[in-house]
Amino acid sequence: MAASPLHIGIVACSAEGAALCYRTLCTEAPGLLGRAYAHPEVSLHGHSFADYDACITRDDWVGVAELMLDSARKLAAGGARFLICPDNTIHQAFRFLEGRSPLPWLHIAEVVAAEAVRRGFRKLGLTGTRWLVASEVYPEKLAARGLAWVRPEEADRLECSRIIMEELVNGRFPPEGVRTFQAVIGRLKDAGCDAVVLGCTEIPLIISDANSPLPTLDSTRLLARAAIRRALEGA
């Protein structure tokens, strides 16, 4: 009998990003497993988003890491074999997780960088919350693969972050938010980018290849697909 795929643990932050990641896992796995409705075992744990938001707002990444580690321990106790976190911003806490987590993680920016190389992109525009875009989460992983990147102008960062935090994470998708992201991505295209990183797991809820001025790298779905592959490789 073939071994079962590895049990995937999801460390959730916002409900919208975690739900999209989980839904992608469950809907795309059957095609790889060759069996209707089949997917690896999945467990999810999430602390209150308010707890994460409080830490992020005061720039307390150690506090973010402690929340993530608590989720990691609970998922490990429940049988998960490796972890994913469908939230780009809190990947800034990864430097405080190293050597302390009970399980290995797939890093969302590493997954996106690998896909950019596979598709032949060379210069990526970054979108996401203001904390993520200002951080080294993506530049560090992109530089390791010889990729260039462009950050939006400050005003664009702040408006995109406002839309994410006030609208998208609350399940609201106003058309003016779509237009704002399209305009920001258009300016990244003018700056020479050949693709855009949807570096917030809620952005794919309003932006896709169908309405983006640039090809998109959907961090949420790419992470879910990488988790499926990892689960199958470890079986």
Where would I find each of the regions flagged by the language model?
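Non-catalytic structural scaffold of enzyme domains
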Residues: M1-A235
